[in-house]
Amino acid sequence: QLTFTPNWGT
């Protein structure tokens, strides 16, 4: 499973 953390979701 890949966990993606968007930086443009602040």
UniProtKB/Swiss-Prot annotation:
GO terms for molecular function: hormone activity. One of its GO terms (cellular component) is extracellular region. The glycosylated tryptophan appears to be identical to the C-linked mannose found in mammals, but lacks the typical W-X-X-W motif. The carbohydrate moiety is not necessary for hypertrehalosaemic activity. It comes from the Eukaryota. Belongs to the AKH/HRTH/RPCH family. Hypertrehalosaemic factors are neuropeptides that elevate the level of trehalose in the hemolymph (trehalose is the major carbohydrate in the hemolymph of insects). This is Hypertrehalosaemic factor 2.
